[in-house]
Amino acid sequence: MEAVPRMPMIWLDLKEAGDFHFQSAVKKFVLKNYGENPEAYNEELKKLELLRQNAIRVARDFEGCSVLRKYLGQLHYLQSRVPMGSGQEAAVAVTWTEIFSGKSVSHEDIKYEQACILYNLGALHSMLGAMDKRVSEEGMKVSCTHFQCAAGAFAYLREHFPQAFSVDMSRQILTLNVNLMLGQAQECLLEKSMLDNRKSFLVARISAQVVDYYKEACRALENPDTASLLGRIQKDWKKLVQMKIYYFAAVAHLHMGKQAEEQQKFGERVAYFQSALDKLNEAIKLAKGQPDTVQDALRFAMDVIGGKYNSAKKDNDFIYHEAVPALDTLQPVKGAPLVKPLPVNPTDPAVTGPDIFAKLVPMAAHEASSLYSEEKAKLLREMLAKIEDKNEVLDQFMDSMQLDPETVDNLDAYNHIPPQLMEKCAALSVRPDTVKNLVQSMQVLSGVFTDVEASLKDIRDLLEEDELQEQKLQETLGQAGAGPGPSVAKAELAEVRREWAKYMEVHEKASFTNSELHRAMNLHVGNLRLLSGPLDQVRAALPTPALTPEDKAVLQNLKRILAKVQEMRDQRVSLEQQLRELIQKDDITASLVTTDHSEMKKLFEEQLKKYDQLKVYLEQNLAAQDNVLRALTEANVQYAAVRRVLSELDQKWNSTLQTLVASYEAYEDLMKKSQEGKDFYADLESKVATLLERAQSICRAQEAARQQLLDRELKKKAPPPRPTAPKPLLSRREEGEAVEAGDTPEELRSLPPDMMVGPRLPDPFLGTTAPLHFSPGPFPSSTGPATHYLSGPLPPGTYSGPTQLMQPRAAVPMAPATVLYPAPAYTSELGLVPRSSPQHGIVSSPYAGVGPPQPVVGLPSAPPPQLSGPELAMTVRPATTTVDSVQAPISSHTAPRPNPTPALPQPCFPVPQPVPQSVPQPQPLPVPYTYSIGTKQPLPAPYTYSIGTKQHLTGPLPQHQFPPGIPTGFPVPRTGPQAQAQPQPQPQPQPQPQPQPQPQPQPQSQSQPQPQPQPQPQRPAFGPQPTQQPLPFQHPHLFPSQAPGILPPPPPTPYHFTPQPGVLGQPPPTLHTQLYPGPSQDPLPPHSGALPFPSPGPPHPHPTLAYGPAPSPRPLGPQATPVSIRGPPPASQPTPSPHLVPSPAPSPGPGPVPSRPPTAEPPPCLRRGAAAADLLSSSPESQHGGTQPPGGGQPLLQPTKVDAAEGRRPQALRLIEQDPYEHPERLQQLQQELEAFRGQLGDAGALDAIWRELQEAQEHDARGRSIAIARCYSLKNRHQDVMPYDSNRVVLRSGKDDYINASCVEGLSPYCPPLVATQAPLPGTAADFWLMVHEQKVSVIVMLVSEAEMEKQKVARYFPTERGQPMVHGALSVALSSIRTTETHVERVLSLQFRDQSLKRSLVHLHFPTWPELGLPDSPGNLLRFIQEVHAHYLHQRPLHTPIVVHCSSGVGRTGAFALLYAAVQEVEAGNGIPELPQLVRRMRQQRKHMLQEKLHLKFCHEALVRHVEQVLQRHGVPPPGKPVASVNISQKNHLPQDSQDLVLGGDVPISSIQATIAKLSIRPLGGLDSPAASLPGLVEPPGLPPASLPESTPVPSSSPPPLSSPLPEAPQPEEEPSVPEAPSLGPPSSSLELLASLTPEAFSLDSSLRGKQRMSKQNFLQAHNGQGLRAAQPTDDPLSLLDPLWTLNKT
């Protein structure tokens, strides 16, 4: 049927238009309502008129349809602006001709014009559809479209124009037209379907639908109303439509028969074909009179259908024999409507074109546009709110992940050398001799350095040899015989000394820079070699990642998901931008102009639908975020392990890179510094060589003069014979030795000689040392050569030490130099050169006799004046400040000429002189203490100790004159031939003097000279005086009483000696040691002053230092513990040692003035950080000697009064001086306490109850304490619930801010050091941690963190682990000096250096690694041993009031348990019994919340304390239950915190302990080392016990190996003594001690000028020069010994 001829189509005629005069009406309306010039719209009106003319004379083609649509649209635009409807203001008559009747119809309504145009549009489309022959597919499509457009136009006209303006536009006619057009469109579609051979069933349904449309049209045509309207046309249309109905019905049944044939339903096939044939016959009947095209189509159909029917009937009759069903029984064919009226949009801009009247916009349109804009904004806000919420979640999630897609998988970067490093390699590749030149330059510098040092050493040797020869000459001929010598030669020699000292000072400063330069070169030369080498080696030196394939897969997966996240972000941003742009460009004002107000809302909804697609995309993007983040979380979990590896690799990579780049950048600087050093030393070498030649010539001249004098004296008559006694040979003094071994105090005799050299100061002090001058003239020469620093210009050059050492300073007053000699029996006048201060007269004192010269060393601040004759003047710069900034004014005095008197032994009394105030000079470095020897030496800043007689006090002291008696606090002469003067502490100035109603001159005005006390004949000052009774002559307001033994130690770093700037000959301070009492001596108190111990001489009483009270008595405080001090009795005196018992006096009062040594008072207590805190080591109880009147019993010491202003001064640690459990009743009491203590926490209920009470108490206490400051620094707190209280937090004084999460925990036990409980440093707070350690002068750090926590990076490693690789934290550099691992802990010795200062502090870092974060240590024993180690290290430090820093991860859990057990153990060891642990816990928590965080920790501490008490009982012979009592073996490890004195180089001890022990090998027995026990520590009365309760002789627990099971007898034999090795004979005699002394970072020096001077041997200890050696003969029958204690040196 596809070739069937096409049926004809029905089409409609066009209506004809009449007049439409709209121009005048529009102009009037514009003028009236818009207020605009109507003439301005003439052009628009012309355009509209032209468009109408084209529309009413439209062409019969597709372009005509566009013209009609455009004109229809412009009419709508005009109507929206100018109301021209029926009855409206601008209505104009419109005329059109009616089609069927040909009449003209007029209406005053613009809608009539629109309706006529719509009708013509539909008619034109029907014409165009019917005109096509439909022979091609394209023609069929075009015709179908035209008929649908025509149906659409008629349908729009029917729906939107309900009023029938004319008959041809009535509703019935319009419905007929719609059905006709749809039927013809469906017919075209049928023809196309048959041409395409669609399925038979589909074609049948399409054909049936054609039948349905035509049936609807036929019913309309049969309507009488319609028939009357149509007239003649109605009959023609009806015949054609009826014929088509039957024809297309036949076509439908034909195709249904084809479908039955396909389904092999042959009976149905026959029925359908029969029906089709019947309907076709009906169509033929109705086709009579139709055109030939219709007849051809019917014939073609008959041939097809007839043939099909005949064939089917035959097949069924002869083959299939199926029954032919009736047509009614078969399934009816339902039509399939595939066409529809195409809608007409009159205002479609694509059709209407631009609005001609766009300039005319009514206000209603603007209002509607605003409403639409609000709808758009609402839509945008809604979407943006969703996007922002999702973006915020995404940003927070990604920030928490800290994942950067660019760095997640950047493994490629590690395979290449970075560009900045490549540049350095390239720069070095063109200079191949870089390393060679640097090494050669440093070698040349080292050679010149060595030459200069050798020359300076030669000069020093010459000067020392000359001085030694001069001394020998004086010893041989006597002072009178020696004579002053040629003054010119001495002046030249003094000039040489000054020049040598100046060059030596410069050389030593430069040697520091030289060593630093060598260190820097050694640090960088390896890196420079690497950078100069092949690139492969450089690449190999950089760390590389070692990842498994699984790790790489994890990285790729994470990278892929991160890319998805980024893609999601980008898509979201893009969609958001599209939405914004679309909304911004969306303007429907033109549409609103043409839209009715009633349809506004509908229009808005339709317009907003254009955003639906973007909204869907955005919502899908937002919904996908949850899935992406879930996948990213899983990938990040897998990435954690890989991330840690890559993070560590990145740190190592950057560190290595920075190190290599820094080495390259340091090369030029090293070369420059090296060249400067060579230039400097070349200049210095020439000057030193000149000085050497000069010194040689002067010394040769001096030697010749001495030889002449000796020859002349030998010719004289020899002196009469004197009693002789054996004396050791006078060996040559060691080089650089400032004093003789016999002249030094016992503390220093066991040290290497370099430790006793006065001017050998560490480099950091060179810049502050005052110049020293020896004035030519007859002043006493030193018996030992010493080096001195000279003033004057330095050699040119800029090669010097660190900058801070060379800063210009004000004229800082310095203390007098220290020289240690026994006090002679005469005095020499030593005054002061007048300065700028007011002048004061100085009372002169006559010479007390003639003897060996008294050595005097001073520190002048300017070249001295040239004096002649016996007059001698020196300018002294006293130190005026300590670290506590105690400033004393400086004044100068006129030194009167000495008055010679007969050579009679006279007692000499110090006369304190009033000193006016002058400008205080701050001193930058601490002045711990100094010793000076002389007569009128001023006592400088607080705590200056002088040995001599007349001394001046500097500072604002009250003006008092002292009677002829030695005031308190001044040297006390010893009786006996070997007695020596004792240095006493400098009295502290008090604000108001107290009157002294004594027979003495009254205080004078400052301008009046002080009268000279007249000497009176009396006993010799150094003769045997068995009946001397000193009376306590005291100035309590000048010398406040202080309980000895508990003064705060000085603040310098433990393990090394900090010398006082400007003071020569300082001995290193020693720690407090204890001595066993010998068979005939009293226990020696701890001693650290630089004083010699006298040897036993003839029988004489020994004074006991007694202490006067404070101005007013106060209760005995923690710092006022009475300590018994007993001086050593004579070796062979049978009488008991008498003691002086002073009585307390609230205020100074009058007293007799006997010429006897009075008692001395201890210095006052100082605040923490005060340089004078060394009083603990130099307090009166440590001074061996003093008068001791007859009488027995212990001295009663008075409690000191703590000043109110000193209320919060730190308390020094109480030492456990002796074993408190020697008494059986103490042991029995401890055993009873242990039995009761065991059951306190026996069951869980008791533990729970105690813990609950502690928690409640903590909450109660915490409510009254503030942590406001800690809350301000939340980033510095590891846990937000663990913060220090404001009241006792540690305050940083020099950081960016003053906060650190650390609390001071004090008051747990008098025997437990103060603790600083802090958290483990965070990566950002490590600098604060080390700053706190530096400011608090901490020497011991306890770390209670397991290795697992550091490996997991829960706790940052804030300390260096490799030597030579220091860590820099802010301004502090921390370096590892040594490391030692034991079974219980790891001990590290660290050095702490502030910025670029050369001075370093050593501290001990004790790490207990076996305490897990959640759990307990393996055993209590390990922790107990660790606590003992901690306490032992703490006792090695100086002073004993600095805190111990203890930290775990949080600073409360393990830290609290450690502090609790530490305090409890110390209480038990002190004999105070077992403390109440809950009370200690509450005391800790009152100072830091959450201390002892777990209940398990409390139980553990209870068990550990039980175990410790059991150990204490076992040590004293009390066995555990079930074991027999064994003899007490004190050789077991003593758990008392006593200093270990039984080792020098032996034993398995940490190197830090050996270093600290060096300073303690100083006390030796007064009777020589005949008794082995004499080398043991002495006893001091234990705190807390009354003096009378101390037995006369008690054993002291010691850490030495030999056992001591019984108290020492009164006079035991040597073989009964415990075998204790003598300190001087341990190890190599000298080199070992020198090695130990140089082990501390402060003592160690690369300065080769110190080499070659350590020549001590065993003979130095056995045969000392001054007769004080171990084998020195002790003459007891020499009557001359009463006059000269150094007589044995002069015997031949």
Swiss-Prot record:
GO terms for molecular function: protein kinase binding; protein tyrosine phosphatase activity. Residues 8-394 form the BRO1 domain. It catalyses: O-phospho-L-tyrosyl-[protein] + H2O = L-tyrosyl-[protein] + phosphate. The modification Omega-N-methylarginine is found at R974, R1671. Residues 711-788, 884-923, 944-1199, 1574-1638 are annotated as: Disordered. GO terms for biological process: cilium assembly; early endosome to late endosome transport; endocytic recycling; negative regulation of epithelial cell migration; positive regulation of adherens junction organization; positive regulation of early endosome to late endosome transport; positive regulation of homophilic cell adhesion; positive regulation of Wnt protein secretion. Its EC number is 3.1.3.48. The active site is at C1448 (phosphocysteine intermediate). It is an enzyme of class 3 (hydrolase). Residues 897-923, 984-1002, 1093-1102, 1127-1165, 1598-1612 have a biased composition (Pro residues). The modification Phosphoserine is found at S1178, S1179. The keyword Zinc-finger does not apply. Belongs to the protein-tyrosine phosphatase family. Non-receptor class subfamily. PANTHER family: PCD6 INTERACTING PROTEIN-RELATED, TYROSINE-PROTEIN PHOSPHATASE NON-RECEPTOR TYPE 23. This is Tyrosine-protein phosphatase non-receptor type 23. It comes from Mus musculus (Mouse). The lineage of its organism: Eukaryota, Metazoa, Chordata, Craniata, Vertebrata. The gene is Ptpn23.
